[in-house]
Amino acid sequence: MSIAVVVDVRESALSIDEVVKNVTRPGAGGIAVFSGIVRDESEGRAVTRLDYSAYAGMAKREMRKIVDEIESEMGGVRVSAIHRVGQLGVGDSAIVCAASAPHRDEAFRACRELIDRIKSRVPIWKREWGPGGAAWVGWVDARCSPASVGHYRHAHGKS
């Protein structure tokens, strides 16, 4: 179980330094960091901005659960993640994750596991905007939308 508050969902700009500080400790010989950045294209379509929505309370609880799982499964690691919501432009950071461990391999593995679990389990929704309008990303059918918060865990394929 982590000592520090290590997860958040917020509208303000993200800081790599903040998540690194959350995982820094004397026994850590390596810290791995991942920052997910808004890019200007997705699957061949131009992207001008992203809108992220979340049920913040549920998202934070699930992120906290993921942190606890990883730290329990991979003894000796500490992980932290902050996800941004609201309107983000190209080049903005949407998520920052960090993991510390006694050795670099464990830090890289923990950081990768953290982002993978967040992307597959946390109820945060992404809408891409471009010259042709907007589209929700990752939703297979209309029942899976930000309006259906209770239905975010499903087996429709993409997460």
Annotate each PLM feature.
Residues 1-94, 100-112, 116-159:
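N-terminal, polar/charged subdomain of small-to-medium soluble alpha/beta proteins
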